[in-house]
A protein has these predicted regions:
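Short amphipathic alpha-helix segments
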Residues: 196-204
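Charge-rich, well-structured scaffold segments of protease-associated domains
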Residues: 1-139, 155, 172-173, 181, ...
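His/Glu-based metal-binding/catalytic segments typifying zinc-dependent metallopeptidases
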Residues: 139-196, 302, 347
Length: 347
């Protein structure tokens, strides 16, 4: 069984890829982990050491470090915390605290099990009833999401041969009107090598080694984020051009650009659904957010229906600027007050 475990902003996750005939044994292991974790004392120190090393290694991954620092400033507490944790918290955690956290947060009320592959539904249902039918636990109570922080610019000074630029701006929530128009708009900017950011910053001018934009959303928030990895000498021009492309998008998209962007999104959707693992993950996410699973046709049709007017309407209601910007590198950059609304401050 190839497996993985993860923590996110508002949930824990377990995943696995395996031969279909091994599903009963795999679900037995998952059942044991979520209902009766052993958490052997002798292994906790080894895991703590690895996690502390991951924190130190963040200094060797400037792109991720910039993202962590941006999220800490952009999202409301406690949702702005990194899944890496912090050194003080990791050192203070012991087995009793972890077991108490398990009792508090792990329950069947919002648990979702998604299985995709060469399996029969009735057999999966019988396994789930046998292995999880007696699961007890109170529903976890998450705090209200709160408000996104006021837009600001912050710089983290690091003596490096690289410069990192990251930004975030509020957008439409998952499932709200304009959600698919928002996805298409961001795809036009930077989800592939055909996006405007890649073409303008990297292909035409050679300003950076990496650039992209993404749209992320759940039922509590929506966020447009962008990243540029460049050199200190080209950082200011890269930032200026990045902001310029964000502000230029409304009213400038051609029908050909729109068609290409939607085709790329639909191709990625189809290719992703060919993997049982991706299908299981998307089904679980849909159920978590919507309480139902969207069909491939539903998503495909929603993307197809997005028009140029829809994109411009989205951009009118959710402009990419003002935004929150963080840079990481040798020196701070010049950022217009109209872009961030608040003066720069040290990170």
């Amino acid at each position: 069984i190839r497996h993985g475990e993860w923590t996110g902003m508002d949930r824990f996750g377990f995943s696995g890829s395996l031969i279909a005939s091994k599903l009963p044994r795999a679900l037995e292991l998952v059942s044991s982990m979520v209902q009766e974790p052993r958490l052997p004392e002798e292994e906790i120190e080894n895991i703590r050491s690895v996690l502390l090393q991951d924190l130190v290694a963040l200094n060797d991954n400037p792109a991720r470090r910039a993202s962590v620092e941006l999220n800490r400033r952009y999202y409301p507490a406690p949702f702005n915390r990194s899944s890496l944790g912090d050194a003080a918290g990791l050192k203070a955690t012991d087995r009793s605290r972890m077991l108490a956290l398990h009792r508090e947060l792990f329950g069947p009320q919002r648990a979702i099990l998604s299985v995709a592959g060469k399996v029969k539904a009735d057999e999966v249902f019988r396994l789930v009833e046998r292995l999880f039918g007696g699961w007890q636990g109170a529903p976890a109570q998450l705090p209200p999401f709160g408000r996104i922080s006021p837009h600001e610019y912050a710089h983290l000074e690091v003596d490096s041969a690289q410069a990192q630029i990251v930004l975030a701006s509020p957008s439409v929530k998952f499932g709200e009107e304009g959600y698919y128009a928002g996805k298409v708009a961001v795809s036009l900017l930077g989800s592939s090598m055909f996006g405007r950011l890649f073409m303008e910053l990297r292909e035409k001018r050679g300003l950076c080694y990496s650039v992209y934009a993404r749209h992320g959303a759940n039922t509590s928030y929506g966020t447009v984020s962008a990243y540029v990895g460049t050199t200190p000498e080209r950082a200011q021009e890269s930032l200026d051009l990045l902001v310029g492309e964000l502000e230029r998008l409304k009213g400038s998209v051609t029908q050909a650009e729109l068609a290409r962007s939607k085709t790329n999104m639909q191709a990625s959707l189809v290719m992703g659904e060919e993997s049982p693992g991706s299908r299981a993950a998307s089904n679980a996410t849909d159920w978590w957010l919507l309480g139902r699973v969207r069909s491939l046709k539903e998503v495909n049709d929603a993307i197809s229906a997005v028009s140029l007017d829809d994109v411009d309407s989205f951009l009118s209601r959710h402009p990419f600027t003002p935004c929150t910007i963080l840079t990481l590198g040798r020196a701070p950059l010049e950022v217009s007050s109209s872009v961030t609304k608040h003066r720069s401050q040290p990170a």
